[in-house]
A protein has these predicted regions:
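Short, high-confidence coil segments that cap the C-terminus of an alpha-helix
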Residues: 54-56, 117-120, 273-275
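Active-site/acyl-donor-binding loops of N-acyltransferases
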Residues: 2-11, 75, 129-154, 276, ...
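Acyl/amide activation-and-transfer machinery of modular secondary-metabolite enzymes
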Residues: 87-95, 139-146
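Aromatic (often tryptophan-rich) hydrophobic motifs at membrane interfaces
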Residues: 60-68, 75, 80, 91, ...
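Short intrinsically disordered coil segments
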Residues: 88, 157-166, 319-326
Length: 352
């Protein structure tokens, strides 16, 4: 998609345009009016991603001046995963959202043309539902989503027995919950948690920008014991959904089941806010987090991420289970926390 196409170009009677600063309200109005759009399609993600020095290529389709489809895209240069055009990096969902098949087709065509022009290794569309069935599909991830019952959360009756017993352990330990945590509190716990998993952490300013951009729809829950933080989660609220997105805990929290207690607390909080759908987030198959979410009574739903290969010869294997990343992950787990906090942001900003 050439740079001079800012004024728009026609594909199959649609006009595809590049997002400009004045388009945010139109873009978000389309998101609000389109059921298949997700929290990660909101326009605010563009400036947040650009805050990590990535170039965004947000596209939208219109017909007779009316927005009929959107496609958020960002270009990532990763020392691990190569040069990619992704919808949407740092987000679990993305891809085209369109009012009609023609608008979807012209946005996909425009994205593929842009990927070819940029000479990326590949274009990745993080679809939540099957799309682009003629493209290579990778089912590395699943998501876990479920409607919360109107009764049985507070008294644990709606919680599966194994998780219920864990929550009672937290209750008996007198764990406390706050839903007004600060980014500073969150970051101290979260950085330790992801270091223990062997993952570089995003910079603190990333989470600060999320809070500023989404306000009360971005909430930090803190679980403490006698004032000492044990677990935390940054959740996103969108329509009638809550996404528990960035979560972590310290090792000492395991003895009192702080993680289980925390997710139970967020379920209670969601119902207080009138939200009924709980999004537990994505997990890789055959992992501990996958099993954990199933034990809460959630069923896995495959995430059919679609790929258009440009310079790459095959769909990339970006799974941490890839032997190629094993030494890095194991080494990162052993880093002193101050070192992982200092180095992590320089690496994580390019992982996407």
């Amino acid at each position: 998609m050439p740079d001079h196409a800012n004024d728009g170009y026609s594909v199959n009677a649609c006009i595809v345009r590049r997002f400009e600063e004045g388009d945010a309200k139109r873009w978000d109005a389309f998101v609000a009016a389109t059921p298949q759009a997700t929290f990660f399609h909101l326009a605010a993600w563009r400036s947040i991603i650009e805050g990590l020095h990535h170039r965004c290529h947000y596209l939208y389709a219109e017909r007779q001046g009316v927005v009929t489809g959107i496609l958020p895209l960002a270009e990532i240069h990763s020392w691990l995963f190569g040069h990619a055009l992704i919808s949407t990096p740092f987000c679990v969902y993305g891809g085209v959202v369109a009012a009609d098949p023609e608008s979807e087709a012209c946005l996909v065509q425009a994205a593929a043309a842009l990927a070819d022009e940029l000479r990326v290794d590949y274009l990745e569309l993080r679809n939540r539902e099957p799309r682009q069935t003629d493209w290579p599909i990778k089912h590395l991830y699943v998501t876990f989503r479920k409607s919360l019952p109107s009764e049985g959360i507070d008294d644990l009756k709606a919680i599966p027995m194994k998780r219920r017993n864990k929550i009672r352990k937290g209750i008996n330990a007198s764990l406390e919950t706050r839903h007004d945590g600060s980014v500073a509190e969150f970051y101290r716990v979260y950085t330790e948690s992801v270091r223990n998993l062997g993952t570089p952490v995003l910079p603190r300013r990333w989470f600060e920008r999320l809070r500023r951009a989404f306000g009360t729809d971005c909430e930090i829950t803190m679980i403490t014991l006698q004032g000492r933080p044990l677990a935390t989660v940054m959740s996103f609220y969108f329509r009638d959904e809550v996404h528990t997105y960035y979560a972590g805990s310290v090792r000492s929290g395991r003895t009192v089941a702080a993680n289980d207690f925390m997710y139970w607390a967020v379920m209670q909080r969601a119902l207080e806010r009138g939200v009924r759908l709980f999004d537990f987030g994505r997990s890789k198959q055959d992992t501990g987090s996958y099993d954990f979410k199933e034990q809460w009574g959630f069923q896995p739903e495959p995430l059919p991420y679609a790929y258009h290969l440009v310079r790459a010869k095959e769909v990339p294997n970006v799974s941490p289970t890839n032997r190629k990343y094993h030494l890095f992950i194991e080494g990162w787990k052993r880093l002193p926390l101050p070192v992982s906090r200092a180095l992590g942001p320089f690496l994580a900003r390019n992982l996407g």
